[in-house]
Amino acid sequence: METREEIDCEALAADVVNKTRTNVLLTKTTMTSIADRSGFNRLTISKLLDKKKDMPLRMWLAAVYESGADPCEILSKAIKEQSALAEA
């Protein structure tokens, strides 16, 4: 497996959360449904999605699945974008 040292993990996490937030908003996914699926408080979920920095994996997966997105697609796209930025 290839090492991607040039990728900024903090920026990658922020990009993934931002893409997830956008999808949650576009699909009108409720914080309650994400909370029910993840076990986190809906206010905490909302706060972390709005910060666009990082969030626990369990919460992120619940947000992705509840909004009907593909977690692999979100991660893959974000990694490709971060790789392109690192190479520029």
Regions found by a protein language model. Give the residues of each.
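Recognition helix of helix-turn-helix/homeodomain-like DNA-binding domains
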Residues: S38-D54
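Residues in the helix-turn-helix
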Residues: S33, T44, E73
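Helix-turn-helix DNA-binding elements, focusing on the entry/boundary residues of the two helices
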Residues: M31, R42, L57-W60
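Short alpha-helical "recognition helix" segments of helix-turn-helix
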Residues: T30-A35, A63
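A short, Lys/Arg-rich alpha-helix, primarily the initiator
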Residues: M1-T29, C72
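Short, basic-rich loop-to-helix N-cap that marks the start of a DNA-contacting helix
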Residues: K52-Y65
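Short C-terminal boundary/hinge segments that cap the last helix of small helical domains
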Residues: G68-E87
